[in-house]
């Protein structure tokens, strides 16, 4: 079982590397990593387990956060209608994105960042993702609003980008016009 001790923190070189694509069929180790990542997210959202194991709540995690520079991510997040988006994605890529932008009212956080970073992280409000499941079956997934923000945050990790790289350095509280704010 993964714990917070397994997650690397900002400053670790794996967080700034562009992760390599996985090849299919996946190794048992790559499949286990995906399962463990999703299990971590589920456990971190269970109050009892989170307290017992000292887990910070998370809705997404990428392999580089575990010092594994492979294009693997997991998300476990509900949208505003309580629909669950629970996936392990291999080699995910953004196929398309909306012109409309969105951000979270309180900014973003990250399991690899042990400090609050004020500022808006403006992202696409809707994205379509191409990825593969653990069996190499192609997936085309659409996300909007909060789940779209989460999956973009995790794909950024696969590209060596941290969420705070998107914050306006001169004015972190600057919000461009016509950006939808969630939360």
From Swiss-Prot:
Which Gene Ontology biological process is one annotated for this entry? co-translational protein modification
Question: Which prosthetic group or cofactor does it need?
Answer: Fe(2+)
Molecular-function GO term, any one: metal ion binding
* EC code: 3.5.1.88
| Catalytic reaction equation(s) | N-terminal N-formyl-L-methionyl-[peptide] + H2O = N-terminal L-methionyl-[peptide] + formate
User: Catalytic residues?
Assistant: 154
Main role? Removes the formyl group from the N-terminal Met of newly synthesized proteins. Requires at least a dipeptide for an efficient rate of reaction. N-terminal L-methionine is a prerequisite for activity but the enzyme has broad specificity at other positions.
Instruction: Output the HAMAP family linked to this UniProt entry.
Output: Pep_deformylase
Similarity field: Belongs to the polypeptide deformylase family.
Write down the PANTHER family for this protein, in alphabetical order: PEPTIDE DEFORMYLASE, PEPTIDE DEFORMYLASE 2
Q: What is this protein called?
A: Peptide deformylase
Q: Which organism is it from?
A: Listeria welshimeri serovar 6b (strain ATCC 35897 / DSM 20650 / CCUG 15529 / CIP 8149 / NCTC 11857 / SLCC 5334 / V8)
């Amino acid at each position: 079982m993964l714990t917070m001790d397994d997650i690397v923190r900002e400053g670790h070189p794996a967080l700034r590397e562009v992760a390599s694509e996985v090849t299919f069929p996946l190794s048992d180790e790559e499949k286990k990593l995906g399962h463990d990542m999703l299990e971590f997210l589920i456990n971190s959202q269970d109050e009892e387990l989170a307290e017992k194991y000292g887990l910070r709540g998370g809705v997404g995690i990428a392999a580089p956060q575990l010092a594994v520079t492979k294009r693997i991510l997991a998300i476990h997040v509900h949208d505003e209608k309580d629909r669950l988006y629970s996936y392990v994605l291999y080699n995910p890529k953004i196929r398309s994105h909306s012109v409309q932008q969105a951000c979270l009212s309180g900014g973003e956080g990250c399991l690899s960042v042990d400090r609050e970073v004020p500022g808006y992280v403006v992202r696409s409000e809707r994205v379509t993702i191409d990825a593969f499941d653990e069996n190499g079956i192609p997936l085309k997934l659409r996300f909007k609003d909060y789940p779209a923000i989460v999956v973009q945050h995790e794909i950024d990790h696969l590209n060596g980008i941290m969420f705070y790289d998107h914050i306006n350095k001169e004015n972190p509280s600057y919000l461009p016009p016509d950006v939808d704010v969630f939360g």
